[in-house]
Amino acid sequence: MHTRSIPTAAARPLLALFALAAVSLGAPAGADPIEGTWLGTITAPQGTVADFGLEFHREKGGALAFKMNFPDMFTYAAEFGIPVEDEGGGRYRITPAFDLELLLEGDRLSGTFGKARLPVALARGRAFPPRPAPQRLPPGPAPLWSYDMGAGTWAPPVVAGTMIYLGTKAGLFHAVNAGDGTAVWTWKGANPIDGRAVVGPGTVYVLDTRENLIALDRARGSLRWLAPLHEGIAGAKAPDNPTFNHRSATPLLLDGVVYCGSGDGGLYAVDAATGSVLWRHDAGAPVYSGVGLLGAGTLMFGTMDGSVVLLDRQARRETLRVRTGGGVVTTPVVAGGILIVGSRDYMLYGFNLADGSPAWRFSYWFSWVESTPALVDGLIYVGASDFSRVTAIDPVTGKARWSTPVHGLDWGTPLVTRDSVFTGTVAQNMEGTVIAHVGGIMALDRLTGAPRWQVLAAAAPENGFGGYAGSLALAGDTVIAAGFDGKLIALRAR
């Protein structure tokens, strides 16, 4: 990993070298003063300092353009096609994608990056460092079995007893034998099923993409009931970037009641036996996160306006609401009196549970945090989107124990076993993509984060995705993964 922790007052030799070189590295005669290459660092709230570089040039039409070099984000001399605004007086702005504000003072370029206003300090340089060679890992185990789901999926498999349950983009919901991958039953719905199912004693519950809560007989796969959770609307979609919003809220089953969020901005309580809506709490914004439980009576969930809500399920009263700067699609978790949640403002947050005050922030640079943390033995394990790492973090201090590149979009919850951490990754092949991703499954050493092996997925189709978007599941000593290629597979957990 390229990041490193440096005390605030510590000398930065890299910048000192840039300063010595700057005497002979001024802008060419007649050029805009900002033109050329700038190298330096960017600093995150947790104290992490990473190498960062910008290069500015004029295009044929005269517009000021830039390239970015940000190794920690796997971004190498990337052109994003976003114009640079010259505000005069040495001030420049790159918005809205990066919220990058810069001030040019001689051979120094400083400013802030992103909504969190991360400090950037640059000096003139000659060229970006060379791109590192791709990492080569030992191949992982071959699948023990493979089941054809009939369509790809964004949803994670759920293991209950000897069975695996999951939905697909085609609206198919499968029950599969975990031992040999044979079909037990398949139910066909009218809409895609992108969310995680919850399994009760005799019923499986899942939300489809049109905000219908579906209850299926666990043994036969027949429909028991369907409850629309969209109060007069035909379903709701996340408000921005629909390419990456293939998700539905995860229900919580508790004491005969299914609690589930909806894109209509409500948190619903539904009778698990009949499908009757018992009540709806207006959360004020679409709810695509899962519902977590604190103690015996407090529900926890996130909203697309950046809120994290704690709700007394008996009194139906909010006991705490804290705000982040972006949509929250992760399920909140609590450890050591700290409420932990990821946000689309590129931050993983820790809030003091007692009063909602900030405890810590962990920056993912300009990567959404869509991975719900796995809390195991006093550590949380979290994936990332473009940051493409699994990170083990102390939930009380917010300090990383280790952080390992996995080279793909990592949206699911890491699967943690006694010795290993397994994660699925996604490759995207969308027009305009500047960050290369790899789809597959990786195994890491739980203690150190060192990579053990990698199973590569088929390449992503044009304007599509490849790999494994949902969390992995554990069935005995096998890892279960469901892919965009329509295959459900089992791998030996080694």
Walk through the language-model features, giving the residues of each.
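Central antiparallel beta-sheet cores of small beta-barrel/beta-sandwich binding domains
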Residues: D32-E105, F113-G114, L166, V382, ...
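Edge beta-strand at a domain terminus
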Residues: A77-G88, G106-R108, T112-L137, L488
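Extracytoplasmic beta-rich repeat domains
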Residues: R131-V158, V184-G200, L223-L254, W279-G295, ...
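Short loop/turn segments that connect beta-strands within beta-propeller blades
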Residues: N177-G181, D217-R220, D271-T274, D312-R316, ...
